[in-house]
A protein has these predicted regions:
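Ribonuclease/tRNase effector modules and their secretory precursors
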Residues: 1-132
Length: 132
């Protein structure tokens, strides 16, 4: 990952993510590289370029969260429904000092449904109230 001056702060990891996912990641700041748009173009994720300024909202208010089983180390996925379903991949920097947005792309509704059914994604409610 680049030096810190090439990064933009986009949010914070919340303890609520740990609670829903049953993990224990350290609650660190989340950054994105200034080069993320170029990465998205290179990976042909054009559809999500219009959502790049929504990253703080996706982090603060995801509809679904999960763990990518294909990634080693600390890596989570956040999905937010807009006109398109937008997935953010967030990883722990190798130095372990911060989290960063590793990828961003759209996912089809059928894929979201399959991942919910398999347990890879879990519904996330920010203001969930406990019922008595």
């Amino acid at each position: 990952m680049e030096e810190k001056e090439d990064l933009l702060r986009v949010g914070s990891f919340t303890e609520k993510f740990n609670n829903v996912l049953g993990i224990s990641m350290e609650p660190l700041e989340i950054f994105r590289s200034k080069g993320l748009p170029a990465h998205m173009v290179k990976r042909k994720h054009y559809k999500c370029l219009k959502y790049i300024d929504y990253i703080p909202d996706i982090i603060a208010n995801p509809d679904y969260i999960g763990i990518n089983p294909n990634e080693s180390g600390d890596s989570i996925e956040l999905v937010k429904r807009y006109e398109d379903n937008v997935l953010l991949g967030i990883k722990l920097d190798t130095d372990g000092q911060y989290l960063y947005v590793s990828t961003m792309y759209d996912v089809q509704e059928s894929k979201v449904s399959r991942r919910l059914h398999s347990g890879r994604l879990k519904q996330f409610e920010v203001d969930k109230k406990e019922e008595k």
